[in-house]
Amino acid sequence: MLRIDPNELELTDRVVHINRCAKVVKGGRRFSFSALVVVGDGQGIVGYGHGKAKEVPEAIRKGVEQAKKNLIRVPLKDRSIPFDVIGKFGAGRVLLKPASAGTGVIAGGAVRAVLEVSGVGDILSKCIGSNNPHNVVRATIDALSRLKSAEELRALRGADTEE
């Protein structure tokens, strides 16, 4: 699979989750932050990243940089996906179903963020198992990466391109 160059794209980023950690030292607590970020161009390209730093803006910046290195292409069909798919990561499962035009994004939290930046406009989703944002984002990306366009499926099956 070809690597997608982020410099050629107009990417938007969305912060999914910010976590504050505390290291207890002799003088008190030292706080650090981690940010889970998704980026996408709104036309079928999406990626996620996890940045950690002492300050929130720096953690977000690091997350965006990492997300730009993990981009995947999603085959869209009329602002939806071509078929039902289940993505898995850890204990998290995400079910994605295509929806008719005008339905909108029926998804919660982390799944909604990933789908909106990727450019999916009409879709139904359900989180099964873990609701941890990290697991849900990775499971959603896994589900989207399992999708194939009609042309790719025909080529895999060796069928002629006639419908």
Curated annotation (Swiss-Prot):
One Pfam family cited in the UniProt record for this chain: Ribosomal_S5_C
Record InterPro entries: Ribosomal_Su5_D2-typ_SF, Ribosomal_uS5, Ribosomal_uS5_bac-type, Ribosomal_uS5_C, Ribosomal_uS5_N, Ribosomal_uS5_N_CS, Ribsml_uS5_D2-typ_fold_subgr
Cellular component annotations (GO), alphabetically ordered: small ribosomal subunit
Keywords, in A-Z order: Ribonucleoprotein, Ribosomal protein, RNA-binding, rRNA-binding
UniProt entry tagged with the keyword Disulfide bond: no
Domain of life according to the entry: Bacteria
Biological-process GO terms, alphabetical: translation
A GO MF term: structural constituent of ribosome
Occurrences of domain S5 DRBM (ranges): 11-74
Family per similarity comment: Belongs to the universal ribosomal protein uS5 family.
Purpose: With S4 and S12 plays an important role in translational accuracy. Located at the back of the 30S subunit body where it stabilizes the conformation of the head with respect to the body.
Quaternary structure annotation from Swiss-Prot or TrEMBL: Part of the 30S ribosomal subunit. Contacts proteins S4 and S8.
Comment, domains: The N-terminal domain interacts with the head of the 30S subunit; the C-terminal domain interacts with the body and contacts protein S4. The interaction surface between S4 and S5 is involved in control of translational fidelity.
Record-given protein name: Small ribosomal subunit protein uS5
Natural source organism: Syntrophotalea carbinolica (strain DSM 2380 / NBRC 103641 / GraBd1)
